[in-house]
C-alpha cells in the first residue's frame, strides 16, 4: 500500500505532498491535476519494470520534455523526484518460490530522474539518485491514524513489527561520489555497486529479482501490483479461449474476466453466490451470474440470468453492467492485491445507485483491524459532487481519505530568476468538521469541510457548463 507521496518536478507538481488511506477519493474539476497524479503513480509503477527510462517515459502523455515541470516556454525542471512511503506484506517470495519474512514492512523509496543533452542535442534521461530505507516504528502514526485507535498491540505488531538494532539502508546514493549501492539483506551482507557516472538508464530497483534483496524485492513487487483500470467493453465481453490463453487474472482493460471467474468458482463455490448478490444489488433485473466451461468451443463463458429466468451472454450486457460485474468479481478474488486506480467510477451509473458502487469500492480495500487482511487499496478520482456527498456515510471511518484538487499559484526561484507557476495542490476534506478550515503549516493549502467541498465542486461545475454554453454560442 502507498501511504504518502512527495513529487517535485513532474508536470504540475512542485514540492507536492499528500497522504493516502486504504480508500482515497480525489475530487476536482477538469484541469486540476487529478489525472496528473495518476500519471505519476503509473510512471512509478513502470519504473520498477526492467526497461530503459526512455521507453517508460515514452508511454506517458506528452513528450519527454513536457513531463518535467515547465517554468516558461523555454525553461523546465532538470530533474524530477518521487518519494513514496509504503506498507508491504510481512512475507514475500521470489519467482523461484524462495520465501522470506521481512524485518521492516514500512519502507520509503526515493527516485530522482534527471535530464541532459548529448553532443547532438538529444535528451538523455538517467537515474541521479535512488534510495530505499526503513521507516522507524517510533513516530510512525499512519496505521493508528487509519484505524482510529482500533488496532490492538498484537495487530500493530503484525503490521509494524519491532526490530532491534540500527535501521539499515537497502539502496543508497552518495551523490558526491556518484555511486548507488545496493545492500544485500542480512548482517554484514555483500554490496553491489553501480556508478551514476556511467549514466544509469534504468532504476536499480527494476533489476531486483532475488530474495537476497528481500526488502527491495518487496517494494518492486508492490509497485508492480499497481493497476490502472481502463475497462474496455470489448475485452469484458469476450470469453477466455483455451487456445489463445492469456491467463486467469483480470487485466486493466478487463481481459480474462471469464477465466478469472471460473478460477474463483473452482476454489470457492460460495464466491459465485456472493458475486451474484452484489451484482443484483447494483443492477436491477439480474439475479444470478453463471460461468461455464464451454469444452466444445474451448473457452470459458460468462452468462447472467435475469429475474424472469432468461439467460443473457456477456456479449449483450451493457458497458455499465460489465464494469460493475468486473468490480464484483475483483471483490471475491483472493489473488487480487495491491493498488487499484479508477477514474470516474460513477460513469454509466444511476445517480441513485452511486452509494452502492462506493460500497463496492470500499469492500475492495484492506481492513487493517483484521488479521491477515490482504493489502488492497483503491484510489479514485472524480468530478462528481454526488460521489463526494456519499462520503458522509463514512464520516467516522479513518480508513477513508477525501481530497479536493485545484491549481494554485507558486513563485519558484531558479538560477537567480523567479517564475510564476500554476501547480497542483491537494486540499484535505475533514468529514467531521464544520465551517472553514485552514492548514496552519502551509498558508497556501486549504482544508475543506464536506459542505465546503460540495459547494466548491457544484460552483465549478456550473461555471464550466456556462463557459461551454458561451463557447457554443460564439461558434454560431
Task: Walk through the language-model features, giving the residues of each.
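Switch/communication elements of ASCE P-loop NTPase nucleotide-binding domains
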Residues: 1-50, 271-274, 278, 285-453
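Short beta-strand micro-motifs in enzyme catalytic cores
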Residues: 80-82, 227, 298-300
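Short, acidic Gly/Pro/Ser/Thr-rich loop/turn segments
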Residues: 89-91, 233-238, 410-412
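C-terminal alpha-helical "lid" subdomain
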Residues: 438-476
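Short acidic, glycine-rich loop/turn motifs
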Residues: 9, 84-92, 134-136, 304-308
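Short glycine-/polar-rich loops that comprise or flank the Walker A/P-loop
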Residues: 80, 107, 224-225, 397-400
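Electropositive, glycine-dotted interaction segments
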Residues: 95-273
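Conserved P-loop NTP-binding catalytic core
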Residues: 39-108, 112-121
Amino acid at each position: 500500500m502507498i501511504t504518502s507521496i512527495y513529487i517535485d518536478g513532474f508536470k504540475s507538481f512542485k514540492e507536492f505532498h499528500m497522504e493516502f488511506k486504504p480508500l482515497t477519493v480525489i475530487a476536482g474539476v477538469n484541469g486540476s491535476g487529478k489525472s496528473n497524479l495518476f500519471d505519476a503513480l503509473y510512471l512509478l509503477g513502470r519504473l520498477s519494470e526492467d526497461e530503459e527510462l526512455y521507453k517508460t517515459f515514452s508511454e506517458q502523455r506528452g513528450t519527454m520534455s513536457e513531463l518535467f515541470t515547465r517554468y516558461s516556454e523555454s525553461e523546465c525542471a532538470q530533474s524530477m523526484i518521487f518519494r513514496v512511503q509504503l506498507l508491504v506484506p510481512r512475507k514475500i517470495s521470489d519467482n523461484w518460490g524462495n520465501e522470506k519474512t521481512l524485518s521492516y514492512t514500512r519502507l520509503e523509496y526515493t527516485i530522482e530522474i534527471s535530464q541532459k543533452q548529448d553532443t547532438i542535442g538529444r535528451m538523455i534521461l538517467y537515474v541521479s539518485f535512488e534510495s530505499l530505507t526503513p521507516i522507524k516504528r517510533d513516530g510512525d502514526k499512519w496505521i493508528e491514524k487509519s484505524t482510529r485507535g482500533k488496532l490492538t498491540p498484537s495487530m500493530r505488531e503484525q503490521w509494524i513489527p519491532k526490530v532491534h538494532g540500527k535501521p539499515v539502508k537497502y539502496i543508497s546514493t552518495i551523490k558526491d561520489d556518484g555511486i548507488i549501492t545496493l545492500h544485500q539483506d542480512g548482517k554484514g551482507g555483500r554490496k553491489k555497486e553501480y556508478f551514476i557516472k556511467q549514466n544509469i538508464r534504468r532504476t536499480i530497483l527494476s533489476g531486483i529479482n532475488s530474495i537476497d534483496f528481500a526488502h527491495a524485492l518487496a517494494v518492486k513487487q508492490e509497485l508492480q501490483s499497481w493497476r490502472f483500470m481502463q475497462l474496455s467493453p470489448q475485452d469484458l465481453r469476450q470469453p477466455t479461449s483455451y487456445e489463445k490463453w492469456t491467463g486467469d487474472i483480470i487485466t486493466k482493460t478487463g481481459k480474462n474476466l471469464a477465466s478469472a471467474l471460473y478460477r474463483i468458482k473452482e476454489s470457492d463455490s460460495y464466491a459465485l453466490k456472493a458475486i451474484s448478490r452484489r451484482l443484483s444489488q447494483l443492477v436491477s433485473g439480474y439475479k444470478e451470474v453463471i460461468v461455464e466451461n464451454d469444452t466444445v468451443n474451448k473457452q470459458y463463458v460468462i452468462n447472467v440470468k435475469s429475474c424472469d429466468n432468461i439467460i443473457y451472454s456477456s456479449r449483450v450486457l451493457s458497458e455499465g453492467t460489465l464494469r460493475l460485474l468486473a468490480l464484483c468479481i475483483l471483490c471475491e478474488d483472493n489473488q487480487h492485491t495491491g493498488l487499484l486506480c479508477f477514474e470516474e467510477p460513477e460513469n454509466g451509473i444511476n445517480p441513485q445507485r452511486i452509494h452502492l458502487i462506493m460500497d463496492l469500492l470500499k469492500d475492495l480495500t484492506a481492513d487493517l483491524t483484521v488479521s491477515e487482511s490482504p493489502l488492497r487499496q483503491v484510489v479514485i478520482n472524480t468530478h462528481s459532487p454526488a460521489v463526494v456527498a456519499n462520503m458522509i456515510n463514512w464520516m467516522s471511518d479513518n480508513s477513508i481519505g477525501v481530497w479536493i484538487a485545484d491549481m494554485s499559484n507558486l513563485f519558484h526561484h531558479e538560477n537567480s530568476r523567479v517564475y510564476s507557476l500554476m501547480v497542483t495542490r491537494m486540499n484535505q476534506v475533514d468529514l467531521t468538521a464544520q465551517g472553514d478550515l485552514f492548514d496552519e503549516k502551509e498558508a497556501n493549502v486549504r482544508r475543506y469541510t464536506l459542505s465546503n467541498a460540495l459547494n466548491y465542486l457544484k460552483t465549478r461545475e456550473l461555471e464550466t457548463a456556462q463557459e461551454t454554453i458561451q463557447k457554443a454560442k460564439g461558434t454560431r
